[in-house]
Design a protein with these regions (language model features):
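C-terminal "lid/loop" region of Rossmann-like NAD(P)-dependent oxidoreductases
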Residues: 156-170
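An acidic site on a long C-lobe helix of protein kinase domains
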Residues: 12, 93-96, 195-201
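Predominantly a Rossmann-like dinucleotide-binding segment in NAD(P)-dependent oxidoreductases
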Residues: 1-92, 216
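C-terminal helix-rich "cap/oligomerization" subdomain common to oxidoreductases
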Residues: 105-106, 139, 181-221
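Short, surface-exposed alpha-helical recognition segments that flank or form part
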Residues: 38-45, 88, 166-174, 194-197
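A structural signal for well-ordered alpha-helical segments within the folded catalytic domains
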Residues: 44, 48-52, 173-180, 197-204
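Contiguous beta-strand/loop segments that form the cofactor/metal-binding neighborhood of enzyme cores
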Residues: 52-147, 176-191
Length: 221
């Protein structure tokens, strides 16, 4: 979690956007395209990661109500240009895109966009945008903090995980950090970065988006 957020440099974060958008990136393996076996498409595949990261960065796991839309528009169409090659467009039964609007108990809004296939060039996956009362942050090209400084609009880019010591920067990849975290939790009893109850909230929100799309109504949590 960024020190800029933990230190309150963004102020009150009242809007967040969770991005998981591919132009053409429909999986072609496993049971990804089978709703009966997979449970859903782009939303539970890549949308879940973007939402999980957004709630964790905000440190806000108290949703109040959810509305959403789910679409099966491009999955049955032309498979040209897909990052993973042609998919089975005759038997796909899951959504290719989904969008959720989440209102938190403190009034903050989270907008979630998830797609395997969408006619857009604005493609961002596992990215988060935050808008606060003092500053904003996005991950379009690394982490960028936008604010007003000395009467002018300003942008700063924190040097994350850089020590200034040659050979020490990024010495461990994400998989190494994750493995060490789990081993440390097992050995010492320390809590992991993401708690089971937090993961449950993510699942509740995803289910609420599907329910809202089915019923056409807002879902209270």
């Amino acid at each position: 979690r960024s020190s800029d957020l933990e230190n309150g440099e963004l102020g009150e974060v009242y809007l967040a956007k969770a991005h998981a958008v591919r132009r053409r990136g429909i999986p072609t393996w496993g049971v990804f395209l089978n709703e009966a076996e997979q449970g859903g498409g782009a939303l539970i595949d890549i949308g879940t990661h973007a939402l999980d990261m957004t709630l964790w960065i905000m440190n806000n796991y108290k949703p109040k109500r959810v509305s959403g839309s789910v679409y099966k528009k491009l999955g049955k169409g032309d498979t040209a240009g897909n990052a993973f090659g042609p998919w089975d467009n005759e038997h796909i039964t899951v959504e290719d895109s989904a969008f959720g609007y989440i209102t938190m108990e403190n009034g903050a809004t989270v907008f979630l966009e998830a797609s395997w296939a969408l006619n857009t060039t604005d493609t961002r996956e596992q990215k988060v945008t935050l808008c606060g009362t003092r500053a904003g942050a996005d991950m379009n090209d690394g982490v960028c903090i936008n604010s007003v400084c000395s009467g002018e609009l300003a942008e700063t880019r924190p040097l994350l995980r850089q020590t200034g010591v040659p050979g020490e920067d990024l010495a461990k990849n994400e998989a190494d950090f994750e493995a060490e975290m789990w081993l440390d939790a097992l050995d010492t009893g320390k809590p992991t970065l993401v708690r089971p109850e937090q993961a449950m909230v993510v699942t509740q929100i995803l289910e609420a988006i599907y329910e809202s799309a089915r019923t056409g109504k807002e879902v209270e949590l």
